[in-house]
Amino acid sequence: MSLRIDAVILAGGMARRMGGNDKGLVELLDKPMIEHSIDRIKPQVKEIMINANRNQSRYADLGYPVFSDEDSGYLGPLAGMITAMGQTQADYLLVVPCDCPLLPLDLVERMLTKIQSEGAELAVASDGKREQPVVLLLKPSLRDSMKAFLDGGERKIDFWYAKHHCVVTEFSDQPNAFINVNTPEQKQQLAEAIAK
């Protein structure tokens, strides 16, 4: 029996460091940043969903289901994950941000292998130096635990990981895979690096 893996792209933040511009819709090399993330993960999953709390019609134009956080108030990435976990029938949910245009093409394969080999509930990606807290593969059945954590006033996702059997999947062979864009300057640097 093959496993079903769906994905959610988190585009629900306020993007304060990008001058309030919706990061997923900021153009990078002539297309919205979120399209780069879609291109990288589409071959790896069955369904893609987009979590966005504004500009929903523009995201819907990309042809994927779009939903906002169940809890209003921009409570961070956990709120988007909780909503996505309630919308999928998949065995696993891949979570990625909208501003990582170089995600590994073997992201799901390596994270799933690590989960299965260690009997874990979730895997978080690492570039070899730092964990990437919003690049993870997890079982949607963890939704109640995550919701209780958020409802208890917690926001730090790594504190939630610590409550579960979480494994780190290292991608040190792809050191640029998790470069993200938080400022206009970073966007320019990344565009120049990709163009080389």
Curated annotation (Swiss-Prot):
A GO BP entry: bis(molybdopterin guanine dinucleotide)molybdenum biosynthetic process
Domain of life: Bacteria
Keyword Cytoplasm tagged: yes
Enzyme Commission number(s): 2.7.7.77
Keywords, sorted A to Z: Cytoplasm, GTP-binding, Magnesium, Metal-binding, Molybdenum cofactor biosynthesis, Nucleotide-binding, Transferase
Residues holding GTP: 10-12, 23, 51, 69, 99
Catalyzed reactions: Mo-molybdopterin + GTP + H(+) = Mo-molybdopterin guanine dinucleotide + diphosphate
Pfam families per UniProt: NTP_transf_3 (PF12804)
Domain free text: The N-terminal domain determines nucleotide recognition and specific binding, while the C-terminal domain determines the specific binding to the target protein.
Reported cofactor(s): Mg(2+)
Subcellular location(s) per record: Cytoplasm
GO cellular component labels: cytoplasm
Name recorded for this polypeptide: Molybdenum cofactor guanylyltransferase
Organism encoding this protein: Shewanella woodyi (strain ATCC 51908 / MS32)
